[in-house]
Amino acid sequence: MHRRAIYPGTFDPITNGHADLIERAANLFSEIVVGIAESPSKKPLFSLEERVLLAQQVTENLDNVTVVGFSGLLVNFAKEYEATVLIRGLRAVSDFEYEFQLANMNRRLAPNLESVFLTPAEENSFISSSLVKEVALHGGDVSGFTDARVASALEQKFSGKRPGKS
């Protein structure tokens, strides 16, 4: 049975935690569409085009994964791609409450769309895009948390913008 799942997020930037979930989801479903949300209210560091490109690079070895940007309601994006499943990651109990509300709202808007929750590998359980950006901003080594191309892109973004530098 062909099952297409959407893994939505802002991915600003994509981390090893995201990449691990994508790879594991790709083993569970016929096709994964990584939907990168425009998310202007979050004021992303990387443009939508940059985030899509970085995610494409990180997932290039996965034949059943496609990366696309989107704006608007997630349920409409899922309908457009004829997906029946949403993949969501849960790092901690604090994620659960928000994700539970989101899953119920999505189910109300699109009753045939199921949410499937995956927990991270232990070594990725603390990684978030926000923490990775904070470490990179202060010149820390993020190579253990992101793909080398993402680490390089962060270095370029923060070059000359670090606290204490003019």
Curated annotation (Swiss-Prot):
User: According to its UniProt record, which cofactors does this protein need?
Assistant: Mg(2+)
Pathway given for this chain reads: Cofactor biosynthesis; coenzyme A biosynthesis; CoA from (R)-pantothenate: step 4/5
EC number(s) per entry: 2.7.7.3
User: What positions does the entry give for ATP binding?
Assistant: T10, F11, H18, G89, L90, R91, E99, N124, S125, F126, I127, S128, S129, S130
- List, alphabetically, the Gene3D superfamilies matched: HUPs
Q: Write out the catalysed reaction.
A: (R)-4'-phosphopantetheine + ATP + H(+) = 3'-dephospho-CoA + diphosphate
The GO cellular component terms are: cytoplasm
Keyword Transmembrane helix listed? The answer is no
One GO biological process this protein is involved in is: coenzyme A biosynthetic process
Entry's Gene Ontology molecular function annotations: ATP binding; pantetheine-phosphate adenylyltransferase activity
Positions with a binding annotation for substrate: T10, K42, L74, R88
Print the keywords alphabetically.
Answer: ATP-binding, Coenzyme A biosynthesis, Cytoplasm, Magnesium, Nucleotide-binding, Nucleotidyltransferase, Transferase
Q: What is its main location?
A: cytoplasm
| Record Pfam families | CTP_transf_like
Name the residues annotated as site: Transition state stabilizer.
H18
Q: Quote the subcellular location field of this record.
A: Cytoplasm
Presence of the UniProt keyword Repeat in the record = no
Biological role stated in the UniProt entry: Reversibly transfers an adenylyl group from ATP to 4'-phosphopantetheine, yielding dephospho-CoA (dPCoA) and pyrophosphate.
The record's similarity note reads: Belongs to the bacterial CoaD family.
Q: How does it assemble?
A: Homohexamer.
Name the chain's protein: Phosphopantetheine adenylyltransferase
